[in-house]
Amino acid sequence: MGNQDGKLKRSAGDALHEGGGGAEDALGPRDVEATKKGSGGKKALGKHGKGGGGGGGGGESGKKKSKSDSRASVFSNLRIRKNLSKGKGAGGSREDVLDSQALQTGELDSAHSLLTKTPDLSLSADEAGLSDTECADPFEVTGPGGPGPAEARVGGRPIAEDVETAAGAQDGQRTSSGSDTDIYSFHSATEQEDLLSDIQQAIRLQQQQQQQLQLQLQQQQQQQQLQGAEEPAAPPTAVSPQPGAFLGLDRFLLGPSGGAGEAPGSPDTEQALSALSDLPESLAAEPREPQQPPSPGGLPVSEAPSLPAAQPAAKDSPSSTAFPFPEAGPGEEAAGAPVRGAGDTDEEGEEDAFEDAPRGSPGEEWAPEVGEDAPQRLGEEPEEEAQGPDAPAAASLPGSPAPSQRCFKPYPLITPCYIKTTTRQLSSPNHSPSQSPNQSPRIKRRPEPSLSRGSRTALASVAAPAKKHRADGGLAAGLSRSADWTEELGARTPRVGGSAHLLERGVASDSGGGVSPALAAKASGAPAAADGFQNVFTGRTLLEKLFSQQENGPPEEAEKFCSRIIAMGLLLPFSDCFREPCNQNAQTNAASFDQDQLYTWAAVSQPTHSLDYSEGQFPRRVPSMGPPSKPPDEEHRLEDAETESQSAVSETPQKRSDAVQKEVVDMKSEGQATVIQQLEQTIEDLRTKIAELERQYPALDTEVASGHQGLENGVTASGDVCLEALRLEEKEVRHHRILEAKSIQTSPTEEGGVLTLPPVDGLPGRPPCPPGAESGPQTKFCSEISLIVSPRRISVQLDSHQPTQSISQPPPPPSLLWSAGQGQPGSQPPHSISTEFQTSHEHSVSSAFKNSCNIPSPPPLPCTESSSSMPGLGMVPPPPPPLPGMTVPTLPSTAIPQPPPLQGTEMLPPPPPPLPGAGIPPPPPLPGAGILPLPPLPGAGIPPPPPLPGAAIPPPPPLPGAGIPLPPPLPGAGIPPPPPLPGAGIPPPPPLPGAGIPPPPPLPGAGIPPPPPLPGAGIPPPPPLPGAGIPPPPPLPGAGIPPPPPLPGAGIPPPPPLPGAGIPPPPPLPGAGIPPPPPLPGAGIPPPPPLPGAGIPPPPPLPGVGIPPPPPLPGAGIPPPPPLPGAGIPPPPPLPGAGIPPPPPLPRVGIPPPPPLPGAGIPPPPPLPGAGIPPPPPLPGVGIPPPPPLPGVGIPPPPPLPGAGIPPPPPLPGMGIPPAPAPPLPPPGTGIPPPPLLPVSGPPLLPQVGSSTLPTPQVCGFLPPPLPSGLFGLGMNQDKGSRKQPIEPCRPMKPLYWTRIQLHSKRDSSTSLIWEKIEEPSIDCHEFEELFSKTAVKERKKPISDTISKTKAKQVVKLLSNKRSQAVGILMSSLHLDMKDIQHAVVNLDNSVVDLETLQALYENRAQSDELEKIEKHGRSSKDKENAKSLDKPEQFLYELSLIPNFSERVFCILFQSTFSESICSIRRKLELLQKLCETLKNGPGVMQVLGLVLAFGNYMNGGNKTRGQADGFGLDILPKLKDVKSSDNSRSLLSYIVSYYLRNFDEDAGKEQCLFPLPEPQDLFQASQMKFEDFQKDLRKLKKDLKACEVEAGKVYQVSSKEHMQPFKENMEQFIIQAKIDQEAEENSLTETHKCFLETTAYFFMKPKLGEKEVSPNAFFSIWHEFSSDFKDFWKKENKLLLQERVKEAEEVCRQKKGKSLYKIKPRHDSGIKAKISMKT
């Protein structure tokens, strides 16, 4: 797959470089369909849109889907490119080459290339009718399937393949080794030179592209405004037209793109989109480098045509997802996302999506962003951009180094980001130039400059849904409003390509922004090491940029925005970057904005917002964060967007995005060259600091989860990682996301506050995390994480910008995210996917849900990092919005209006309405989360908090029993219903729209739902290479096993490995050459290497996204992610067996879902960005949810809940979305009732599959109907090990040491146990307690050692040797007695309390005379000393024992008394036995008869033999040999004959029960054979000696003891001694007699002693008799039995004869039965 992706990517890249046609060709797989559908592109798009589940109406839906498809395609390319970038970052030459080239060609192919070739891609995608789903599919299909496979998969997928192919081609052209293998090869060193040139070219391309993107963004913004007006209405009305929401987004993206927008915006939009996609960070670059505004609608193909949709998406995405822009409102989130983020979100979304797509989140970006917009963003955007007026941008992007730069920044970003070891990593341009300064922070697609890329990826994941949002800029893109971003682009034209928007978002909603300001700055071309790292700039510069970005924003608002960003932790004082990246408090403190102070974007650390989003809480900026995430007006806008059209909201975010983008562009342009150097230097510094912080603040992740870390991380991490983040953003952000996922989950309390404004880097795309913690060691992952984090950041941005949007348009449903992530597993991290889905879903869902219920599009899957900060991760995520191509209809429970944004979430979209069964709707995902948290599962009571924006949401969000969020459907698959949580009983999310969306089942391995790959634990399969289709990214080792995306040509991807199986690495991407190595188990989940063709492989889920929680997946359950910043108390770490605990609920979420039950195994971590959203971790009791469906495959039906029995079969990929199977009931042990079916999850989802308005079936898995109220909250919170209430007996009972079996803890739920059927009857405890209580148990006393006061060691005197002291100490610890008890037993001979064994132990360990002397001496010497040192415990104990009167003498007498009696009795028994045997052998009648028979037969046999015949006797030694003498026919032995003869002739009782054995019993003979007279004599002598000693000791006691202690000892011992003497003498006499008798017996049998012996020993004599007796008895038993039978027969015969025949009338037929005979009697 990887290589194929690489090929596709290269092809796309080359083609894009070559030009629109070439791009189309190169993008073949994606564009092929688009191209194939070229003239009939709209048909194809419509077809794809419909097929993708986004088709909704074919034309517009198809168009939107085309855009989504093109986005998906672009994302595939971007994803591949990202992968290439990552690989390059790690690999160096290949990375750079691929980054610069792939970024230019690959990512630009995704974005740039698409831009260059955008016309083709755009047209092909758009015209091909690629849908969002298709787009996601194309990313999925970006396998080498080429047009064929792409088409087979989805129209969009061919586009993705085309894009990827183009990217691959361009990559090939750019890279020294054009082979896919090289691109994805770990050995891309040959491309290092190319990498350098690519970096330079990427820088130039970025600059040019940034300019073009700026122009494009402006055009797009205009188009978006135009279309945004169209889409804004649609998004606002998205509730009703949820299909419209998606379709609207699609319309914005696809409609405009597919329609008029396609032609004009096809090239332009595609280019813009590709530029945006490539430059989510380059959004600024896009504005800066406005790709000639070919046409307003042509900004990005998706953007131009779908600018209205894209703009709303952009607005929503940037605003609601990326930033707390007013446009981000609950309604807007759902419907207004497109409107509100049209300009911003679209720009950012597109950029982010592109960046993410380049990062390898095509599916996420494209599919999630907009049904079509996402693919178009990736595929069509570039295509349209290339085709449309944006063609120059496309040309400049892929065509010119500058545009390429915009797509993939060549800064050291790539290499410094993290060590890329896998091909995907090498191929994923972590820091590739492709990320444009304007990249949407939310879509930190290709933070080429590490941050940019990371943020881009994050943005992509967050803004992936908002490809349109890409244009918005990383920040807005985080939310990734599929349709809105276009509008935002139009509205935010002032905001230069997402980079400015990124910056704005980063600044305005750093914590909410998808991309950290550094990323934004980088995207915006802001120079600064910030590109590679967080941008370092003065507050004044930021304000200026914001002003420039926000043309309409007053300086006060910009400053306020900056403060918010700081509060969110997105913007950090530069000093904080290196100080405490993880300290969210720092971020909070940073809330006060100082123009003269140096700031950097929180690079890796997820801002508090991010954390909040990660938490899954949707409270928009939590007040705790300090300044509200969004400006009040922004929050207002969010609400307005929700209530009003999103376009209005989009405009403000758009302006902000524009300002941010401009600022970012300025920043990028200011220090592009400097940034690279600074980034390299800063990255190194930050890496060191991050590593340091990682070590120093390993818990900070948790802290971040608690929110402080998210904040501090957002700030400090963004500060520290700011520069590095640009580079490491992908790696670091990924890693940080992982960490932040932890942080996010762990810091739910700070969610609200943190949500306020997570720093850009904190955006989902870049969850802030301790720079040290994540930056250094995790740098590798940071890049990938960055990709993932980008969406997170985007989410954060959304939080800040589009809190409402986030809520309204929850991040793309996990399905979408998943499909996006899977669609571009390698190229776009789940975050990207998340972004894309988020954008797309958010737009469509926002639109659809906004009106209908404010139900955010499914919040990011709890486990979905890609959902950037899926609330669902932290909380039950809202159902993922339908795939881009399909509008997700409001969930049944979606009807519930979204709750208004939480107080602190001014900019956060309101949390989606709780699921029907959900008690409390989960708070909307953080703006940076991009994905709204799913409403709490019905049973969950409280949905898990949305993941923090900056922090990927830790996978744990799903409650142990809740089976939390399901992964979003694969990008190309449409939106699969989220797999039901194993324990959650949540029905699987509806299948992906485009995929015949079978509900993605939790990972098949689902004893444990595959956690979204932990950042370090394993990443869900990275998106497949563009040409490869979407191969599943290798699941992280500890991540549970995300199903690898299907190979490009592989129709349905292989089912993900069973969770219990560990995470099998996904098949290598076609273009990957070497499949990405699975993440190290202990490393957290390293992001899979980016697919070569995928652009940047999806970074591991953002720390806050889901991976962070599961980073510990490898060997352990997933540790609970740190509580979200605003979440308050982080959820307790999951039980050892629990796997990943759900993140604590977001501050507004209320109760966080309980961590998965221990039996649940590890909840699946959020899916990796490239993987899309993995199915949410199953509830602990549920077992493992089925793995999420592969991106390229529809969504496989979620596996039945562990306890559910058989899950409904997943719908066939082509089936459309089958109704999500009702979640199977949790196993009895789960204690959690199965969650109700997703509101639309069941058939409702299906109906929507074909339409753009795929019902948002809470596909996220969390949005689906909440688990039964008691299920999620109670079952999850209960001990994982018990499904029954604890019993508290009235009295302490005796223990019953059985082995407990707990059903819910059974990993293998397939086998049923009887215990599942058995019910405990009620019992009467009273009688039972009386019988089995511990009433007789004495009060347990403390060990005697505890009764002795122990002084300080220094003051203790040790007089005993170490060994002796240890022995006495052990004895003391074993004695639960008081010294008075011991004294009582010794003095009064009372053994009731102190038994003889204890007395013996005390006697053996008593103080010896010398020891006692020392002790006494010390006591005397210390009496006069005031501060004398006390004795050690052993010495004290021995001394106290010695104080007992005559302890030694008394105990000796007591012990001897007991042993003497036992010894005498034993000797007596043995002697008696000997005497008995001797007498029997001599005089026993049976013995005589037997011996006589033996003699007779022997003599007869020896007759005639003079030497042996005529014997009078025989030696006894022949007796044992009789059994060996056989008859002539060997039928029997002589002994058997003798026995038979004896019984028949001598034993009158033979055959009777009273028959007696004639010989001594064998066992008696054996005992006698073991006796020795010498032993008897020895024992008697010893007893006699001891008796004398006892008498002496007793005499001493008599003499010394006082009268009070004399009795009863004296009386008792005197009696004993007298009797003992008598007994001892008697036994001596008995022994003498027995010995004499034995000798007589041996002589009697003429036994002679053996040579050397004086006399015959008992052993010699009795051994012979023992053997003979044993053999004789065996035959005797058999013969006796035969005789008995014969006698019975004879008796019967006699009886018969006596009765006579006359007594019976026997009929032949009755003659056989006695009964018959009796009845026939006459």
UniProtKB/Swiss-Prot annotation:
<comment type="function">
    <text>Actin-binding protein that is involved in actin cytoskeleton assembly and reorganization. Acts as an actin nucleation factor and promotes assembly of actin filaments together with SPIRE1 and SPIRE2. Involved in intracellular vesicle transport along actin fibers, providing a novel link between actin cytoskeleton dynamics and intracellular transport. Required for asymmetric spindle positioning, asymmetric oocyte division and polar body extrusion during female germ cell meiosis.</text>
</comment>
<feature type="modified residue" description="Phosphoserine">
    <location>
        <position position="516"/>
    </location>
</feature>
<dbReference type="GO" id="GO:0015629">
    <property type="term" value="C:actin cytoskeleton"/>
</dbReference>
<keyword id="KW-0968">Cytoplasmic vesicle</keyword>
<feature type="compositionally biased region" description="Acidic residues">
    <location>
        <begin position="344"/>
        <end position="355"/>
    </location>
</feature>
<feature type="region of interest" description="Disordered">
    <location>
        <begin position="1"/>
        <end position="104"/>
    </location>
</feature>
<dbReference type="GO" id="GO:2000781">
    <property type="term" value="P:positive regulation of double-strand break repair"/>
</dbReference>
<feature type="coiled-coil region">
    <location>
        <begin position="670"/>
        <end position="706"/>
    </location>
</feature>
<feature type="compositionally biased region" description="Polar residues">
    <location>
        <begin position="172"/>
        <end position="182"/>
    </location>
</feature>
<feature type="compositionally biased region" description="Low complexity">
    <location>
        <begin position="427"/>
        <end position="441"/>
    </location>
</feature>
<dbReference type="GO" id="GO:0005789">
    <property type="term" value="C:endoplasmic reticulum membrane"/>
</dbReference>
<dbReference type="GO" id="GO:0016192">
    <property type="term" value="P:vesicle-mediated transport"/>
</dbReference>
<keyword id="KW-0472">Membrane</keyword>
<feature type="compositionally biased region" description="Basic and acidic residues">
    <location>
        <begin position="61"/>
        <end position="70"/>
    </location>
</feature>
<keyword id="KW-0991">Intellectual disability</keyword>
<feature type="domain" description="FH2">
    <location>
        <begin position="1283"/>
        <end position="1698"/>
    </location>
</feature>
<dbReference type="GO" id="GO:0005819">
    <property type="term" value="C:spindle"/>
</dbReference>
<dbReference type="GO" id="GO:0070649">
    <property type="term" value="P:formin-nucleated actin cable assembly"/>
</dbReference>
<dbReference type="InterPro" id="IPR042201">
    <property type="entry name" value="FH2_Formin_sf"/>
</dbReference>
<protein>
    <recommendedName>
        <fullName>Formin-2</fullName>
    </recommendedName>
</protein>
<dbReference type="GO" id="GO:0005783">
    <property type="term" value="C:endoplasmic reticulum"/>
</dbReference>
<keyword id="KW-0009">Actin-binding</keyword>
<keyword id="KW-0539">Nucleus</keyword>
<dbReference type="InterPro" id="IPR000591">
    <property type="entry name" value="DEP_dom"/>
</dbReference>
<dbReference type="GO" id="GO:0051295">
    <property type="term" value="P:establishment of meiotic spindle localization"/>
</dbReference>
<dbReference type="GO" id="GO:0003779">
    <property type="term" value="F:actin binding"/>
</dbReference>
<dbReference type="GO" id="GO:0005730">
    <property type="term" value="C:nucleolus"/>
</dbReference>
<feature type="compositionally biased region" description="Basic and acidic residues">
    <location>
        <begin position="631"/>
        <end position="640"/>
    </location>
</feature>
<keyword id="KW-0597">Phosphoprotein</keyword>
<dbReference type="GO" id="GO:0048471">
    <property type="term" value="C:perinuclear region of cytoplasm"/>
</dbReference>
<feature type="compositionally biased region" description="Pro residues">
    <location>
        <begin position="897"/>
        <end position="1246"/>
    </location>
</feature>
<dbReference type="GO" id="GO:0006974">
    <property type="term" value="P:DNA damage response"/>
</dbReference>
<keyword id="KW-0963">Cytoplasm</keyword>
<dbReference type="GO" id="GO:0042177">
    <property type="term" value="P:negative regulation of protein catabolic process"/>
</dbReference>
<keyword id="KW-0206">Cytoskeleton</keyword>
<feature type="compositionally biased region" description="Gly residues">
    <location>
        <begin position="51"/>
        <end position="60"/>
    </location>
</feature>
<feature type="region of interest" description="Disordered">
    <location>
        <begin position="126"/>
        <end position="189"/>
    </location>
</feature>
<dbReference type="GO" id="GO:0043066">
    <property type="term" value="P:negative regulation of apoptotic process"/>
</dbReference>
<dbReference type="Pfam" id="PF02181">
    <property type="entry name" value="FH2"/>
</dbReference>
<keyword id="KW-0227">DNA damage</keyword>
<feature type="modified residue" description="Phosphoserine">
    <location>
        <position position="482"/>
    </location>
</feature>
<keyword id="KW-0217">Developmental protein</keyword>
